[in-house]
Amino acid sequence: MKVGDRHYHTIWLNEDGRSVDIIDQRWLPHEFRVVTLKTIADIAVAIRDMWVRGAPLIGVTAAYGVAIAMAEDPSDTHLDSVWEELHETRPTAINLRWALNAMREHLRALPEQERAEAAYQRAAEIAEEDIELNRAIGANGLKVIREIAARKKPGEPVKILTHCNAGWLATVDYGTATAPIYMAVEEGLPVHVYVDETRPRNQGAYLTAWEMNGHGVPHTLIVDNAGGHLMQHGDVDLVIVGTDRTTANGDVCNKIGTYLKALAARDNGIPFYVALPSPTIDWTVHDGVKEIPIEERAGEEVSFVQGRAPDGSIASVRISPEGSPAANPAFDVTPARLITGLITERGVADASPEGLKALFPERS
């Protein structure tokens, strides 16, 4: 997508052919920074400390991490070691495991002397596949927006609420939940997006609002607890969110607070959709609440908030009393029964084993 007058992906191969460049998302929306990752340690830090984030982008970054590692040491031992090191960085996002497995399975079949080149090629393929998957998700989600727009008065916007950032910054390009929105705007459909701030890391306020602003999408930033109120008063027509892991029965694990939005949507009769590429589906898990490991992040993310100070510097300030401990679960699970549909690259599925298998019969 565009930043200013230039088109960017969130990650790309450096001109040296070995390192990778990323948009360092820790500084958005106040500063736009590109950094170069040269080692497997750089990759691990970038994923763990959320220089990059979003399940699809985490997977692609890990794939390039394997490539960097193979250029250093293409042995089986190193391949397995890198798999373990990267897998531990963000345990909830299933795309991470999917990408690491795809890389390891592809490389194990090759002689060591061929692995480095093959690894970079496969990582680039995974990145390109992500773009195509998101483009298809956008086209399928656009149909949902069109259906709602058709019931509106001419010029009346479709009012969409989204949570966290499932935008192009969470993928290589387009995004998942935002792809249908961008396509609707390109088609000329009037939309208005309500952007949850999404505490504690404020990815809605920092990232989604930045995306919407950059692409001229009408939007309003709201506090996390305002969504239910807006739904009660008819200000939301549709909720679209992303997911970090979706189970075989249609449960969705997404940023903390998603479950509450789904409950409010159900109580007010508002359709609640989840946009996801198929690598986000964990076909081995059938009960999201019981089986998905929920990442617990540092309490400091709750106790401190980052922003631009009056002198123009980026500062972190404490917002809670010293000595007050903070819990920080990063995700929650929305049961399939609360989900209207799963927007995938193959179409919109019911959030059920039958619905998913109808679109992915090879998993039957």
Swiss-Prot record:
The active site is at D244 (proton donor). NCBIfam families: eIF-2B_rel, PRK05720.1, salvage_mtnA. One of its GO terms (molecular function) is S-methyl-5-thioribose-1-phosphate isomerase activity. It comes from the Bacteria. Substrate binds at R53, G54, A55, R90, Q203, N254, K255. It comes from Sinorhizobium medicae (strain WSM419). Belongs to the eIF-2B alpha/beta/delta subunits family. MtnA subfamily. InterPro entries: IF-2B-related, IF-M1Pi, IF_2B-like_C, Initiation_fac_2B_a/b/d, M1Pi_N, NagB/RpiA_transferase-like. SUPFAM superfamilies: NagB/RpiA/CoA transferase-like (SSF100950). Its EC number is 5.3.1.23. It catalyses: 5-(methylsulfanyl)-alpha-D-ribose 1-phosphate = 5-(methylsulfanyl)-D-ribulose 1-phosphate. This is Methylthioribose-1-phosphate isomerase. GO terms for biological process: L-methionine salvage from methylthioadenosine. Pathway: Amino-acid biosynthesis; L-methionine biosynthesis via salvage pathway; L-methionine from S-methyl-5-thio-alpha-D-ribose 1-phosphate: step 1/6. Keywords: Amino-acid biosynthesis, Isomerase, Methionine biosynthesis, Plasmid. The record marks C164 as: Transition state stabilizer. The gene is mtnA. Transmembrane segments: none annotated. Pfam families: IF-2B.
